[in-house]
């Protein structure tokens, strides 16, 4: 930080200094403006005893404020670039993990055959669970549709298709899925299928699930991994969000992925 002084000799030396300018940075622009303002001062102000006072308080405050704004802007730009590079590395690492490779063949809650290619051209948020889940699945689906609603409310953003795939095909047939998804979002799509079809889709996304022992009422709990998956319009797995991530955090992440998306198929 440069210190202003009342000494005429020191002030003369200070006025002769040429600030270093970093081309292309906001900090450099602030230093340019500082130098220009100093050159516009003309004769130094004098105090009661004829001693040079340097620039007035208002000018010094203006210079300090502009210099601080330049540094703040440069810091924000560096932070945004760092976040972009981190997201790029994360996306590449997830793709190398080969999550979501291959196709799946299931039935939606209206009885129509569905495969992964049906969602090409759309952003998709996908969750694996089961309709008899007492608490976690409803909470995660509510969070998922909250993200969808937040993004729907922003003009200019493409729509996001919410998808719920069962890991309990024994109980979650087409009718059960239809009753269940209607309580969350009008566009939430429920998918089910045979035991083999569900296992194939779950395995593709590295979803673990295991049905527990049945009680006297033939009821049981399915233990399964908990994550919301994001697929881009190319149908590629792009990111996932664990239970600890809030709807706001997921929405922010989806926005960033949308802004950075470039199709590899076109």
From Swiss-Prot:
Q: Which residues bind Cu cation?
A: 133, 137, 224
Full protein name: Protein SCO2 homolog, mitochondrial
Out of the domains of life, which is the source? Eukaryota
Primary localisation category: mitochondrion
Stretches in topological domain Mitochondrial matrix: 42-60
Q: List the disulfide bonds.
A: 133-137
What Gene Ontology cellular component terms go with this record?
mitochondrial inner membrane; mitochondrion; myofibril
Q: Which disease is it linked to?
A: Mitochondrial complex IV deficiency, nuclear type 2: An autosomal recessive, severe mitochondrial disorder characterized by hypotonia, global developmental delay, hypertrophic cardiomyopathy, lactic acidosis, gliosis, and neuronal loss in basal ganglia, brainstem and spinal cord. Serum lactate is increased, and laboratory studies show decreased mitochondrial complex IV protein and activity levels in various tissues, including heart and skeletal muscle. Most patients die in infancy of cardiorespiratory failure.
A GO term, aspect molecular function = protein-disulfide reductase activity
Cellular compartment(s): Mitochondrion inner membrane
The answer to whether the entry has keyword rRNA processing is no
Q: What is the effect of changing residue 114 to H?
A: In MYP6; remains stable in mitochondria; reduces the level of the protein copurifying with COA6 by 80%
Q: Where is the Thioredoxin domain?
A: 85-259
GO BP terms: eye development; in utero embryonic development; intracellular copper ion homeostasis; mitochondrial cytochrome c oxidase assembly; muscle system process; respiratory electron transport chain; response to activity
PANTHER family (alphabetical): ELECTRON TRANSPORT PROTIN SCO1/SENC FAMILY MEMBER (PTHR12151), PROTEIN SCO2 HOMOLOG, MITOCHONDRIAL (PTHR12151:SF2)
The role this protein plays is:
Copper metallochaperone essential for the synthesis and maturation of cytochrome c oxidase subunit II (MT-CO2/COX2) by facilitating the incorporation of copper into the Cu(A) site of MT-CO2/COX2. Could also act as a thiol-disulfide oxidoreductase to regulate the redox state of the cysteines in SCO1 during maturation of MT-CO2/COX2.
Subunit structure, as described in the record: Homodimer. Interacts with COA6. Found in a complex with TMEM177, COX20, COA6, MT-CO2/COX2, COX18 and SCO1. Interacts with TMEM177 in a COX20-dependent manner. Interacts with COX20 in a MT-CO2/COX2- and COX18-dependent manner. Interacts with COX16.
User: InterPro entries from the xrefs?
Assistant: SCO1/SenC (IPR003782), Synth_of_cyt-c-oxidase_Sco1/2 (IPR017276), Thioredoxin-like_sf (IPR036249), Thioredoxin_domain (IPR013766)
According to the record, the segments passing through the membrane are 61-78
* Annotated keywords: Cardiomyopathy, Chaperone, Copper, Disease variant, Disulfide bond, Leigh syndrome, Membrane, Metal-binding, Mitochondrion, Mitochondrion inner membrane, Primary mitochondrial disease, Transit peptide, Transmembrane, Transmembrane helix
UniProt tissue specificity: Ubiquitous.
The family note in this entry says: Belongs to the SCO1/2 family.
**Organism this protein belongs to:** Homo sapiens (Human)
**Which parts of the chain does the record assign to the membrane side Mitochondrial intermembrane?**
79-266
Membrane topology category: Single-pass membrane protein
